[in-house]
């Protein structure tokens, strides 16, 4: 059973990432691959975008975490994902799974369910619509974006967490993170994160980095989620207008690189539901 310690030190997990410099093996999408690599570096971890089916089985053992994102899936990606997931599960390397577009495309939904059923996934991270879709609810999606209000998302999170024995993160206006019978709400962030492509993918690989550096997946996942929200807030504070989206995107990397454990601790807004 998971427990939530309201006094846990968010900043400890950022410090661990920077001390351990975990290697994150990412099989991710082409749209946001560069953003994922840069946010990982800014946080203090090391990314590797190794996706060839001829290489992944040899590369996974070198990593501390595996991040799977199906945003631009193709057959070679599928082959590589299965090989990587098998090796990671064999070696007990944590897997973070981002079911991008599963709400809109049945073949993606089938792939994600198969991975969850057959491999040891440490965390599922998706928007409200994707998470509800995985649980068999009707989610409303427009392409890769969520249009779902997620009124019952806490219950859905709990069902998925217990079914697949994994941590579940549903992102939205507030982010809900569930493991077993415990759900916490992260209230950091800004609507501007939803106006640039890649913010969700960056969060997914950050979770991978934080989990890869820690023995406590639960608290590390929470800390990673807070980190992304906090640097989003800082980036918004650094621009002159809400239309400065290019500057906002760059500022995310700047503030992640400069983020201190003290700032993360002081600005984190986490509560148990």
Swiss-Prot record:
<dbReference type="GO" id="GO:0005524">
    <property type="term" value="F:ATP binding"/>
</dbReference>
<feature type="binding site">
    <location>
        <position position="171"/>
    </location>
    <ligand>
        <name>ATP</name>
    </ligand>
</feature>
<dbReference type="GO" id="GO:0009229">
    <property type="term" value="P:thiamine diphosphate biosynthetic process"/>
</dbReference>
<keyword id="KW-0418">Kinase</keyword>
<keyword id="KW-0460">Magnesium</keyword>
<comment type="pathway">
    <text>Cofactor biosynthesis; thiamine diphosphate biosynthesis; 4-methyl-5-(2-phosphoethyl)-thiazole from 5-(2-hydroxyethyl)-4-methylthiazole: step 1/1.</text>
</comment>
<dbReference type="InterPro" id="IPR000417">
    <property type="entry name" value="Hyethyz_kinase"/>
</dbReference>
<comment type="similarity">
    <text>Belongs to the Thz kinase family.</text>
</comment>
<keyword id="KW-0479">Metal-binding</keyword>
<dbReference type="InterPro" id="IPR029056">
    <property type="entry name" value="Ribokinase-like"/>
</dbReference>
<keyword id="KW-0784">Thiamine biosynthesis</keyword>
<dbReference type="GO" id="GO:0009228">
    <property type="term" value="P:thiamine biosynthetic process"/>
</dbReference>
<feature type="binding site">
    <location>
        <position position="198"/>
    </location>
    <ligand>
        <name>substrate</name>
    </ligand>
</feature>
<dbReference type="GO" id="GO:0000287">
    <property type="term" value="F:magnesium ion binding"/>
</dbReference>
<keyword id="KW-0808">Transferase</keyword>
<dbReference type="GO" id="GO:0004417">
    <property type="term" value="F:hydroxyethylthiazole kinase activity"/>
</dbReference>
<keyword id="KW-0067">ATP-binding</keyword>
<comment type="function">
    <text>Catalyzes the phosphorylation of the hydroxyl group of 4-methyl-5-beta-hydroxyethylthiazole (THZ).</text>
</comment>
<feature type="binding site">
    <location>
        <position position="125"/>
    </location>
    <ligand>
        <name>ATP</name>
    </ligand>
</feature>
<protein>
    <recommendedName>
        <fullName>Hydroxyethylthiazole kinase</fullName>
        <ecNumber>2.7.1.50</ecNumber>
    </recommendedName>
</protein>
<keyword id="KW-0547">Nucleotide-binding</keyword>
<feature type="binding site">
    <location>
        <position position="49"/>
    </location>
    <ligand>
        <name>substrate</name>
    </ligand>
</feature>
<dbReference type="Pfam" id="PF02110">
    <property type="entry name" value="HK"/>
</dbReference>
